Amino acid sequence: MSQKSRHLALSLVPAAILAGACAPQPAATTTPTPVTLPAKIGTNPFFVESSLPYHAPRFDLIKNEDYQVALEEGMKQQLVEIDAIAKQTTPPTFENTIVAMEKAGALLTRVSKTFTGVVGANTNDTLQKIQDAEAPKLAATNDAIYLNDQLYQRVKSVYDRRSAGNLDPEQVALIERYNRDFVRAGAQLSEADKTRIKSINQELSKLSTDFTNKLLAGTKVGALVVDNPSQLVGLSNDEIQTAADAAKQRGLNGKWVLPLRNTTQQPSQAELTNRAVRQKLFELSTLRTERSDTNDTRSTIRRMAELRAEKAKLLGYPTWAAYALATQGAKTPENAIKLLTDLVPPATARARSEAADMQKLIDQQGGGFKLQPWDWQYYAEQVRKAKYDLDESQIMPYFELNNVLQNGVFFAANKLYGLTFKERHDIPVYNPDVRTFEVFDANGQPLALFYADYFKRDNKQGGAWMDQFVDQSALTGWKPVVYNVANFTKPAPGQPALLTYDDVTTMFHEFGHALHGMFSNVQYPTLSGTNVPRDFVEFPSQFNEHWALDPAVFANYAKHYQTGASMPAALVAKIKNSQTFNQGFSMTEILAASLLDFAWHTLPAGSAPQDVDAFEAAALKRYNVDVPEVPPRYHSTYFSHIWDGGYSAGYYAYTWSEVLDDDAFAWFREHGGLTRENGARFRDMILSRGGTVDAATLYRNFRGRDPSVEALLEQRGLKSSDSIAK
C-alpha cells in the first residue's frame, strides 16, 4: 500500500455518538441556567471539570459505569439549558441565543468526547452496552434541540439580522452555521415530517451502533488461525512470534493468529508464500461480516441506505448524497463523481499494466495459474524486488516507532512550526499502550496535549484516526487535547516496534490532523479545529504525509534500530524511485470504494437493493472500476467509513483532498520546502482557521488560485497513462 492508500477517519466510532451531543458540540465552563447535580457528584469524575493540565480526562478515576450516569445527566442538563434559551422573553441577540447555545451542554460535551474516544479505541462489553442504550437517547436529545421551533425562530431572527449588527466575520460564520444546521436537521418541516425525521434518526442511531458492534466482532472472529507455523512461511521470526502471542491472548495456546486489518487486502499477503493461506486470509477478510451469522451486516446496511434516502427526500433532496454534499466543497454528487470517474481511465490502465507484469512473473516461475486478488500483494512485492531491488524487510529495521515519532513526525513539526514536545508520565491514560506528550509553541508557551495510541488491540476498531478530548476555544479559554489512534502490529515483549513505510506515512497523516486541531485559533467551539467540510479535513493530514520523504526529515529518523546507522543512500534512492510503484492498484481500489459509496447514497427513496453483492458488482461495472484483480479497498459490508464513521457519501473526500494536498505541496517545493516561513504561512492561512472561513476561499487565498489535478497525477505517476478529462 502506498502513502496515499492509507485511510484515516477522524473517528471510527458510530456517527450517532459523534453527533449525539448538541451538534455542533459545545464545550464550555459555564451554563446559562443553574442545574442541580445528582447526589452521585461525589463519585463521578465527570460532574466536575478535570483538575488535570489542559482539562484532560481523569482516566485514573473514571469507571465504566460513570459514563452512563454522566451521559444521562448531561442530556438532562443540556435540555434544561436549551429550554431556557428558547423561552427567553428578551429579543434574540447573538449573545443571548447563539453564544448561549455555544456555552450549553458542558457536562454532555465532557463525557461524550471522552466516551467517543474510549469506545472506539478501548471498548469492552460494558461500554458497548452503554453505547447501545445511549445512542438513541443522544439522537433524541439532538432532535429535541434542532427541531425545537421556538429555538429555531430565535436563531433565524439573529440570522436574518446578521448583516445589520456590529458582528465580526467569525460571529457571522457561526450564525450561518447554526441556521444551516437547524434547516438541515428539519427545523422548517411540518410537525408530521419532524415526527418521521425523529423516528428515522432513532433507527439510524441504533443501526449505526449495530453495525459497529457486528464489524468489531466479525473482524475479531474472522482472524486467520493456523495450527502449524509452516503455513506462515515468508513471515519474519518476529512476525511469527507476534502471531503466537496473539493466539495466546485469545486462549489458543499452540496456535498462531493473524488478526484482520480493516481493509480488504491484508499486509501479510505480501509475505506469505503459501498461496492457499493467502486465499484463506483474503476470504476471511472479505466475508468477515457476510456469513449469515449474528455478525452479518447486510440487512443493517440495506436498511441504513433506505432510511438515509427517505430522510433526504423529506428534507428536499433527491438523494442522501445530494443532501450530504450540499455543505461540502464539491457541492454536488455530480461534481465529486466527475473527479473520480475522470481518474478511472489512467488508474485502471495502470492497474491492468501492473497486473500484466505480475502475470508475466507468475508464468516465468511456472505458476500455472491466473493472478487473483489474494495474489496481488505477494507478486507486487516480488515485482518491486525485481524492478527496484527493494523489499519491506530491508527497510523496516530503519523505521522503529519511537524514532519515527520523535525524530520524524515531531522533527518535521519543529522545523516547520517551531513546536517542541515533552513526554508526560503523570497524565493518566485509558490503556497502558497510550503515551502522552505536552506540545509547546515556538515561543515556549504551552499549546496542546497529545495522546498517541498506535498498537492494534482486539477491542480497538480498525484503521487510524484523530479526534479531540477537548476543543480549542477562546470563549472557554481551553487549549486542545488531541489524540491519534492507529493499528500497528504490537511487537513481542522486549522487541522493537518496527514499521512498514505505509505505517510511517500513517503516523505523519494522523499527526497532520492533530496539527489541524492543535493550531486552531478561533473564538467558538463549533468552528474549532477540524470542524470543516469532510472534503477539506483530509487536506492537512494528507499534506503532512509529504514530509515523511523530505530529505532532511527522512535522514533524521530513518536509522537502524540496532546500530543507529542512517539508511544507506542506495536504499533511500530505491524507496524514492519506487514511490509511484503499484499506484494503479492503490488508486483503483480507492476509486472503487469511493464510487461504491456513491452507488449506495445516490439511490432514491424506496429503491434499496435486496442483494448486496449483486448491487455492488453492478455498481463497480457501471463506473468501470470492475478490475477483477483489484477489489474495492472496502466492500460494502465492512465499509466502516460510510456506515458508522461519518463519511456517508464522503469517502471521495480523500481523493478530493488529495488534489489539494499535492497542489499545496507543489507550492512548498516552489518556495523552498521545509522552512519556518512556509510553515508559518500554512499555519496562519489554513491550519489555524478552523471553520471560520469557507474552505475554498482558504485554499484560494493560500495558493493564489484554485487547485489543479496535475500535481496529483504527477505524484501518483499517472501522467503517462490515459489522458484525463480536465
What label would you give each PLM region?
Residues 35-62, 66, 234, 242, ...:
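C-terminal, non-catalytic "cap/extension" segments appended to globular domains
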Residues 170, 174, 203-206, 213, ...:
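Active-site-proximal, well-structured secondary-structure segments within enzyme catalytic domains
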Residues 18-21:
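C-terminal motif of bacterial Sec signal peptides marking the signal peptidase cleavage site
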Residues 28-242, 668, 726:
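N-terminal helix-rich structural modules
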Residues 23-25:
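Bacterial signal peptide processing site
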Residues 51-66, 115-134, 157-199, 259-299, ...:
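Short His/Asp/Glu-rich catalytic/ion-coordination signatures at enzyme active sites or charged loops
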